[in-house]
């Protein structure tokens, strides 16, 4: 058994290029940047920030969504597979390119953050919004009964941190 699964959260480096074919299928390509923060080791050594650029490929329905809603600077959550292909350049040298073929995408940028204020988001993002709204409400509902209980019975006091 083997697993080929990639999960990325990053920023779109340039507006996607989308090609539509006579068959009705579409392919979108764009670069995505992921950045590891810089930090300082205990001995004072500075580790600089590091940015990786990933070649992203989306096809069919995802390519259409990318065409309509994804722009340079947008923050995306992507799931997909990594693939490497090769080709010969003009001088005959063999070149290799590694790409991420997207299976799932979630837009993390707020509506209208980078382009056209009020631009509609794809349905996948709209489906996420109600879940995000419910999550803050659940802890509030749980917190109300625990406030009514005596402090010694509060399970939050038993936390190890």
Curated annotation (Swiss-Prot):
Sorted UniProt keywords: DNA-binding
Keyword Transferase: no
Keyword DNA-binding recorded: yes
GO cellular component, one term: nucleoid
Biased composition (Low complexity): 119-152
Superkingdom of the source species: Bacteria
Pfam families: SSB
CDD domains: SSB_OBF
Disulfide-bond pairs as recorded: none
Segments forming domain SSB: 3-109
GO MF annotation, one: single-stranded DNA binding
Subunit and interaction comment: Homotetramer.
Name recorded for this polypeptide: Single-stranded DNA-binding protein
Classification lineage: Bacteria, Pseudomonadati, Bacteroidota, Bacteroidia, Bacteroidales
Encoding gene per record: ssb
């Amino acid at each position: 058994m083997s697993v080929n699964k990639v999960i990325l959260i990053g920023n779109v480096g340039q507006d996607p290029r989308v090609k539509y074919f006579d068959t009705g299928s579409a392919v979108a390509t764009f670069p995505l940047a992921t950045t590891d923060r810089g930090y300082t080791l205990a001995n004072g050594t500075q580790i600089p920030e590091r940015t990786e650029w990933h070649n992203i490929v989306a096809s069919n329905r995802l390519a259409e969504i990318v065409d309509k809603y994804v722009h340079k600077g947008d923050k995306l959550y992507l799931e997909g597979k990594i693939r490497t292909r090769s080709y010969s350049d003009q001088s005959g040298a063999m070149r290799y390119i590694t790409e991420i073929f997207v299976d799932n995408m979630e837009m993390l940028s707020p509506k209208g953050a980078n382009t056209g204020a009020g631009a509609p988001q794809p349905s996948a993002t709209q489906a996420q919004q109600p879940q995000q709204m419910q999550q803050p409400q659940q802890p509030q509902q749980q917190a109300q009964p625990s406030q009514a209980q005596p402090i010694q019975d509060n399970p939050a006091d038993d936390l190890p941190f």
